[in-house]
């Protein structure tokens, strides 16, 4: 992996039978020549969301909340405010599955700032969420109708934990999640052991450059610091029903519920659990999550039925947000002894369905859904080019705008395709078409993330009218 991609430092761990095999690579800090060890402290970024989800499910186990409770029933620090009074309430279930209708950016004017305006400059105090969301957190879509990855939903879950328990989230996680699992070097706030911390880097033309350290305001979504040793203990617990050799944090049935499909826009795609993404590797059920912060990238994989886990923590990896998930997926397939999915040449096209799937699938919602728009731009168009269906992403990236061939992937289902993303280090991706339950129109679902694009009838018709006859 690291022969193909430049990094400053990396830690990889494979967890089996409650034990971790560890490999360190590169440097934790260039200036001091510190190596990467099992006790190097990394920022794990959005993998923090999985810990916040566990804290929420602990409250559910204790009967302090119900998953279908309106979030506002438990929030004391601020309110979730719908853009349309006709919207239903945002529930805790919605927040756990990124289907709350809350957008990716709470303050659109800050979208071009560091971390989309969710962090503070070095030395600046981190404002409480009651101040950060003092005008309320806007809900821009009917809850439950649209999947949008958002830090603000999990920041809100962290606030619910604090408001229900009367304890700061950092203290609650330490006492009820980290310490029971033996994760003694893990914290939500910056650790005191500065000499053990990895420095985040970005790779420039002249070499690695240390990134400016900024603390996240949306703590429950992205603020945790941890070590490979502690993350190994965490994965061990996730693979053994919520317990490891040090203690337990959840009942096994609760963890099973978290890994089950809780949001699944189409039964043919894996969908989302509570705080975890779902997938499949050669018929093996897998659970995963990625983390991204400036200078740091992280990835965890679990194969619960095989009691196999994998984690990777990286500093200074150029475009690691693209290649780290793909490279670790390759490693996970190898550990499971199964082949990675590939483009098939043995499945025939079905031209009779092309008129159904061809057309425009716009990216709906706020322009502040930056991550989604970085993948699909203003949306996608399915068209026939060279006698075969292609998917054009409406983006300035020339290769995506020219189009990606839609390769049939299932001999029993003509609406399932695969696209080749290997030039970006992403392997292949599965695309599923089906009729939307709500509207009856054609919808496009992605396997990589549970995002849905819906075909626009009027845009597609306008395109047909402009075409020469």
Summary of predicted features, one role per range:
Residues 1-44, 64-66, 80, 134-137, ...:
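Short, conserved catalytic-motif segment at the N-terminal edge
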Residues 30-37, 320-328:
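A short, polar/charged loop-to-alpha-helix boundary motif
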Residues 322-469:
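Peripheral terminal and inter-domain segments
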Residues 67-83, 181:
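Short, glycine/proline-biased beta-turn/loop segments that scaffold the active-site neighborhood
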Residues 299-316, 443-447:
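Short, well-ordered beta-strand elements
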Residues 239, 292-294, 305, 315-318, ...:
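Short, glycine-/Ser/Thr-/acidic-enriched flexible segments
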Residues 12, 18-20, 41-68, 154-162, ...:
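Active-site SXXK
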Residues 19-22, 29, 83-299:
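Short, surface-exposed loop or secondary-structure junction motifs
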């Amino acid at each position: 992996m690291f022969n193909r991609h430049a990094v400053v430092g990396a830690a990889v761990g494979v967890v089996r039978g409650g034990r971790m095999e560890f490999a360190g690579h590169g440097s934790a800090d260039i200036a001091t020549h510190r190596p990467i060890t099992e006790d190097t402290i990394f920022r794990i970024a959005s993998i923090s969301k999985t810990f916040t989800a566990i804290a929420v499910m602990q409250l559910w186990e204790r009967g302090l909340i119900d998953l279908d409770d309106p979030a506002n029933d438990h929030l004391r620090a601020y309110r979730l405010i719908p853009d349309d009074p006709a919207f239903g309430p945002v529930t805790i279930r919605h927040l756990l599955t990124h289907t709350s209708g809350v957008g990716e950016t709470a303050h659109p004017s800050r979208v071009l700032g560091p971390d989309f305006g969710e962090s503070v400059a070095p030395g600046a105090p981190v404002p409480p969420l009651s101040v950060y969301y003092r005008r309320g957190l806007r809900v821009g879509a009917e809850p439950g109708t649209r999947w949008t990855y958002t830090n603000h939903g999990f920041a809100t879950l962290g606030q619910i934990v604090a408001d229900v328990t009367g304890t700061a989230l950092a203290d609650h996680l330490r006492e009820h999640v980290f310490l029971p699992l033996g994760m003694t070097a893990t914290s939500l706030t910056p650790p005191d052991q500065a000499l053990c911390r990895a420095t985040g880097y970005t790779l420039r033309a002249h070499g690695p450059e240390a990134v400016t350290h900024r603390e996240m305001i949306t703590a429950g979504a992205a603020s945790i610091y941890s070590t490979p040793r502690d993350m190994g203990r965490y994965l061990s617990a996730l693979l053994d029903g919520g317990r490891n050799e040090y203690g337990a944090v959840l009942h096994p049935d609760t963890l099973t519920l978290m890994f089950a499909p809780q949001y699944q826009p189409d039964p043919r795609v894996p969908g989302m659990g509570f705080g975890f993404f779902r997938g499949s590797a050669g018929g093996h059920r897998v659970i995963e999550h990625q983390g991204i912060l400036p200078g740091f990238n992280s990835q965890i994989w679990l194969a619960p039925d095989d009691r196999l886990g994998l984690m990777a923590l990286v500093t200074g990896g150029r475009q690691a947000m693209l290649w780290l998930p793909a490279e670790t997926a390759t490693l996970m397939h190898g550990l499971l002894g199964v082949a990675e999915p590939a483009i098939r040449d043995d499945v025939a096209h079905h031209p009779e369905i092309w008129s159904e799937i061809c057309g425009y699938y716009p990216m709906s919602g706020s322009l502040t859904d930056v991550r989604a728009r970085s993948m699909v731009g203003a949306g996608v168009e399915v068209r026939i080019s060279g006698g075969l269906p292609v998917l054009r992403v409406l983006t300035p990236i020339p290769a995506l705008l020219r189009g990606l061939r839609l390769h049939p992937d299932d001999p029993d289902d003509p609406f399932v395709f695969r696209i080749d993303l290997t030039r970006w280090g992403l392997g292949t991706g599965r695309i599923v078409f089906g009729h939307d339950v709500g509207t009856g129109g054609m919808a496009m679902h992605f396997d990589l993330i549970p995002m849905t694009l819906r075909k626009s009838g009027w845009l597609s018709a306008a395109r047909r009218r402009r075409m020469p006859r």
